[in-house]
Amino acid sequence: MQYYDEVQEVNERRKRRILAYYEYIDARTRDQMAEVVHKLIEQRQSQGLSQQNIAEATGMAAPNIARLESCKRIPTMQVLAKYADAVGMEINIEVVPIAKNVAEED
């Protein structure tokens, strides 16, 4: 019985680590996307454009632009690229090292 308990404990720790890592990645991704979206909003506003103007330029529905700007969901790259193009910008992705990895903790 002791071996079974040890295996269960190892599995539980693994599940907790995986969940913590998922939450970390989700939060980091949301923060990064929010930063990009806020830069696009600033650009839109500096040009005096409305959400409706962006909707017309991108072929997207105005409510979808509002939803994008609310940062409640993580947008696709295609959606970000359309919006960026509408305000004369482009999305540039970089791969850079991170200082700390949650998966390596524990």
Question: What feature does the model see in each segment?
Answer:
Residues 1-38, 101-106:
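N-terminal flexible/basic segments that precede or flank functional cores
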Residues 2-5, 9-10, 38-55, 82:
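Short basic helix-loop element that most often maps to the first helix and adjoining turn
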Residues 31, 42, 70-71:
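Residue-level marker of alpha-helix boundaries and capping positions
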Residues 35, 75-78:
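Charged, alpha-helix-enriched surfaces in structured cytosolic catalytic cores
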Residues 50, 61-64, 76, 90:
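Short coil turns linking two alpha-helices in DNA-binding domains
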Residues 56-74:
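Recognition helix of helix-turn-helix/homeodomain-like DNA-binding domains
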Residues 59, 78-94:
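DNA major-groove recognition helix of helix-turn-helix/homeodomain DNA-binding modules
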Residues 88-106:
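Short C-terminal boundary/hinge segments that cap the last helix of small helical domains
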